[in-house]
C-alpha cells in the first residue's frame, strides 16, 4: 500500500498527535505483523488507530462491529475507547492473524471487550441484532458493498459506518484503473449516491469514508 499523504507528512501528523498509552505495545505488534504476515501494510497504523479510538469516544459507542480483524491494531485501539460495558465483535478468516490479535488484546487489558469471530463477514453480520453504534469495514474489498448494505439496517440512528482503504493508494483517481480498483470506485459511487446517508471521505492513511444515516 502506498501512502496517499506523503510519508514524512504522515510521520509529522503522528508526532504532533497525543501519544497512545499503548504505543510501545503497538510497536511490538507492528514488528511481529511485519515478521509473520505477508501483507503487513493492512495494519491501520498509529494515526488511523488513534482516530478510530477517538471516533468511538466521540460517538459514545457501546456496540461496535469490525469486519477484518487482521492482527488486531484497530480492534485494540477501538476497545481502548469503549466504556467498561462496551463490546466489539470482530471477524476475520485468518486464524493465525487473529491469534496474534487475541494475544496482544490480552496484554493490552482489553480482551474482555472484544468478541472474536472466525469466519466470513456476512455470516457474522447475520448473527447480530442491532442497533450497532459503529461499524468499521476493513475486510475484502469485493465484499464492501454487501457489508455496507447488510450493516446499514442494523446501524443506530446516530451510528457511524467507517469504510477503510477507499482511496486505494490513489489508484481510484487513475484514468485506467484495474478491476479491483474499479470495485472500490463502485462502492464509493454507491455510497455517494445513497440518499439514505451522508458520507464524507477523508484522506487519512489510505482513505476513510465516514457514513451516517440522514
For each of these PLM feature ranges, what is it?
Residues 1-134, 141-162, 166-214:
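A short alpha-helical cap/connector motif
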